[in-house]
Design a protein with these regions (language model features):
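Structural beta-alpha unit
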Residues: 1-5, 73-101, 141, 148
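Intrinsically disordered or low-complexity boundary/linker segments at protein termini
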Residues: 1-25, 125-151
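Catalytic cores of nucleotide-enabled group-transfer and carboxylate-activating enzymes in metabolic
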Residues: 13, 64, 68, 93-101
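Short, solvent-exposed amphipathic alpha-helical segments in soluble enzyme
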Residues: 30-37, 94-95, 118, 150
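A generic structural signal for well-ordered alpha-helical segments
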Residues: 35, 70, 93, 125-127
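Residue-level detector of structured alpha->beta connecting loops
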Residues: 39, 74, 97, 128-131
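Gly/Ser-rich helix-loop-strand patches that form or flank binding pockets
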Residues: 103-141
Length: 151
């Protein structure tokens, strides 16, 4: 068996994407577990968009709770500003040496053949050298009667 180990000294760096979604705590828990398993650095990124200014109070409170939860789980909290969320995530990942991104996805909607790409599709194309882990929100899918990403 002649297997080569590619860059065995490369340190893993996990990035979790923060949001006001109720399922974001599950995403944060998954990313924190990955960081522990890989003995990796752990960061949490919130991308503040112009629309963030109009977020409802309930969503703002949930976002703050998710930020505090990520911090409690050991993440370094980072905020980026911009209107292109996938670009901001990919750019932060590139500049910070992120090796894995953990992001949530509520439900899979029907995308038309020529429709706009989803946030995760854009992120995959903008960060081709980063492992991207998409965590579906099964509860939201069941509540809405839609299929999850992996069904």
């Amino acid at each position: 068996m002649d297997e080569k180990i590619i860059n065995p000294t490369k340190k893993e760096h996990i990035l979790v994407c923060l949001s006001s979604a109720p399922s974001n705590t599950k995403i944060i828990q998954t990313a924190a577990a990955m960081a522990r398993a890989f003995h990796a650095s752990f960061s949490a990124l919130y991308v503040k968009t112009p629309a963030s200014e109009y977020m409802e109070a309930e969503d703002k409170n949930r976002l703050l709770a998710n930020i505090h939860f990520a911090e409690k789980c050991g993440a370094t909290i980072v905020t980026a500003c911009g209107d292109d969320v996938p670009f901001q995530i990919a750019e932060y990942a590139r500049l910070s040496g992120i090796t894995k991104i953990v992001i949530g996805r509520s439900v899979v909607g029907k995308r038309r053949f020529f429709g706009r790409p989803t946030l995760t599709e854009k992120l995959i194309s903008l960060a081709p050298n980063v492992d991207i882990h998409i965590i579906p929100d099964s509860d939201a899918a069941i509540a809405k009667g839609k299929k999850t990403l992996f069904e």
